[in-house]
Amino acid sequence: MLEQSESHAFINNAPKEDRIQVKFEQLFESLPLPLRAEEALSKLRHDSARLMILKTSDPTLNMSTYSIEDSPMGFECLKYNLSDNNKLLSQNNYRLPDYLEEDEIVSYTFSKTGPTTSKNKHPSHSNTIRSPPYKVKKESCHTEINNVSNVSTESINVIDASRGYSPYTSVDSLSVSKNRSFISLEESASNQYDAAEAFYFNADSSSPLRKLSPIELPVTPIRRKTPTINPNSELKRLQTFGKLILHKGSRRR
């Protein structure tokens, strides 16, 4: 468990000399990227980098942000300000610690005071979800996720397997917004409102993962059946709106 008081903040100026090549997943190919991918990737060190997408209208950040993750050991995260005609205005490199392992859920946030991180081992998948540590009061629950076409039921497949992603079969809570355009999946360590990891997407789009967006306030979630994470673990709190990142991939060592 990594408490917020123990969160690590890391300084700028991580090495970025080596150019790398990355084959983008369909998810990222379908997204409009104001920042040229090769320009961003040229600033990373390792050959196992993966693209993380974050676009936010958070007034505290006052920018649109796209992040690139670079990690066989630890993380190299680049933050770009794209608010001026989609040009690269500023860049901050943050070095996160090397203790992160595979199959961990990691909460990561960019802030004015620097990045912080918390982690929790998750037994069911190797995907990593990034989201800011806002507070959330949400009852933990569990559901099986099966079908992406019917957002009005309890069976929702948030990940299209044909795109190379494994379905999340043990997400702790599921809710659909009132207009059923957005779906929220949150993972929680217990019933104590003490942890949540969420990603949002537009379920009305022809490609569910094409647009990552903030969600409306959710409807009542489904009741928990069985816990899927160690109840002794904790993740940072987050709110059901804000900037969120969906990030896929097993780390290559």
From Swiss-Prot:
Region ranges (Disordered): 113-136
Source superkingdom: Eukaryota
GO biological process: cell division; mitotic sister chromatid segregation
Keyword list, A-Z: Cell cycle, Cell division, Centromere, Chromosome, Cytoplasm, Cytoskeleton, Mitosis
Disulfide bonds: none
Localization terms from the record: Cytoplasm; Cytoplasm, Cytoskeleton, Microtubule organizing center, Spindle pole body; Chromosome, Centromere
Main location, first listed in the record: cytoplasm
GO CC, alphabetical: CENP-A recruiting complex; chromosome, centromeric core domain; cytosol; nucleoplasm; spindle pole body
Known function: Component of the CENP-A recruiting complex that ensures the integrity of mitotic spindles through maintenance of kinetochore factors mis6/CENP-I and cnp1/CENP-A. Seems dispensable for proper chromosome segregation.
Subunit details: Component of the CENP-A recruiting complex composed of at least mis16, mis19, mis19 and mis20.
The protein's name in its UniProt record: CENP-A recruiting complex protein mis20
Species in which this protein is naturally found: Schizosaccharomyces pombe (strain 972 / ATCC 24843) (Fission yeast)
